[in-house]
Each structure stands twice: as C-alpha cells, then as structure tokens.
C-alpha cells in the first residue's frame, strides 16, 4: 500500500469530517485506535468496506475513488491510529 497516497486521498476526501482522526458527525466514532477496535474497524478490510459502501452519515466513496486509492487510505488510517494521529 502507498501510505503517502493514502494521506493525499484522506486530506482531499476524508479530512472535512475526520481531521486528526476525529469525527465531526458522530464524535464517539473516531478513527482513534481504541474506537476502531471497539467498533471492529481495526482492519484494512473493514475500513475499505465502509469507505467503499458508506454507512449512516458517511457517504460511499466506491464510485469516486479507485479500489487502490481506498486501500491506500485504509492503510493510512490504520497507520495513523497506531501513531495516535500525531
């Protein structure tokens, strides 16, 4: 996976709601490590599924981003969660 590309995709498509690993719509559903684990989202496959298909207030990006871009952004999110989004 290309983490640098994932960061670019995140900044362009995700940061409006998820800057710094937060969640402006549902504050308890952050991209922080503990929240990802608690919600069963601490795997690339789980994140790629949700980014592709959307859920609740989160739109589906499957029609807007390529599979490889979605995989890159999922790897970026997991990488950042391991580093505490610092």
UniProtKB/Swiss-Prot annotation:
Q: Which Gene3D superfamilies would you find in this protein's record?
A: Cytochrome c-like domain
As for subcellular location, the record says: Plastid, Chloroplast thylakoid lumen
An example GO BP is:
photosynthesis
- Pfam families recorded: Cytochrome_CBB3
State the post-translational modifications: Binds 1 heme c group covalently per subunit.
State the superkingdom.
Eukaryota
Q: Which UniProt keywords apply?
A: Chloroplast, Electron transport, Heme, Iron, Metal-binding, Photosynthesis, Plastid, Thylakoid, Transport
Chain sites annotated for binding heme c: 14, 17-18, 58
An example Gene Ontology molecular-function term: electron transfer activity
Q: Name one GO cellular component term.
A: chloroplast thylakoid lumen
Q: Which family does it belong to?
A: Belongs to the cytochrome c family. PetJ subfamily.
Q: What does this protein do?
A: Functions as an electron carrier between membrane-bound cytochrome b6-f and photosystem I in oxygenic photosynthesis.
Quaternary structure, per UniProt, is:
Monomer.
- This chain belongs to which protein, by name? Cytochrome c6
Which species is listed as the source? Bumilleriopsis filiformis
Q: Which gene encodes it?
A: petJ
